[in-house]
Regions:
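Short acidic-glycine-tyrosine-enriched beta hairpin
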Residues: 67-82
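A cytosolic small-molecule/anion-sensing beta-strand core signal
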Residues: 57, 73-74, 92
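Generic protein-terminus/edge-of-domain signal
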Residues: 1-64, 70
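Double-stranded beta-helix
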Residues: 104-124
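Amphipathic alpha-helical segments enriched in hydrophobic/aromatic residues interleaved with Lys/Arg
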Residues: 117-152
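Ligand-binding loop in jelly-roll beta-barrel domains
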Residues: 83-105
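A conserved hydrophobic position in a structured secondary element of the catalytic/binding core
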Residues: 80, 101, 130
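Short acidic (Asp/Glu) patches
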Residues: 80-84, 120-122
Length: 152
């Protein structure tokens, strides 16, 4: 039986009831950091005002967005806009990142660019193909910068 939309939990970050954990409007962590705490499964949930980019570098993920399930076995970025019900099941050898952006940050970026970030407006899955090395480097740098600023 499918859960009613009102019974789907709304989180800032999955499994946390606290306010946003950083003064920034950005959060970055490895997929294993949180998913390993939940036996490699992130149950269906949603975020009121957060955009998420799930970057699967390697391993396997079952991605569910709004009831549609897809098996991911290649380097892929999954975009999840605010209020979309989503959940994941990961293999234990999963490698990758979750980048979470607060809606005010996205609005600020859109204002500075003078255009909406259409790629963030709808859920989508994008195989990274030849851009894999560059994305690996960018996400690694983001995580290092985020973890460095969080501990400062």
């Amino acid at each position: 039986m499918k859960a009613s939309r009102s019974s789907i939990p709304v989180f800032k970050l999955y499994g946390e009831n606290q306010a946003w954990p950083t003064p920034d409007l950005l959060h970055c962590e490895s997929i294993p950091k949180r998913s390993s705490l939940h036996h490699w499964e992130i149950k269906p949930h949603r975020h009121a005002d957060l955009y998420q980019l799930l970057y699967v570098q390697s391993g396997q993920a079952l991605v569910e967005v709004e009831g549609r399930r897809e098996d991911v076995r290649e380097a892929t970025i999954q975009v999840v806009p605010p209020l979309m019900v989503h959940g994941f099941q990961f293999s234990e050898n999963i490698e990758g990142y979750v980048l979470t952006l607060g809606a005010p940050l996205v609005a600020q970026l859109e204002s500075q660019l003078g255009a909406p970030l259409a790629v963030l407006a709808a859920a989508g899955r994008y195989p990274v193909g030849r851009d894999r090395q560059r994305l690996n480097s960018l996400f690694k740098t983001l995580l290092e910068e985020y973890e460095g600023s969080a501990s400062a």
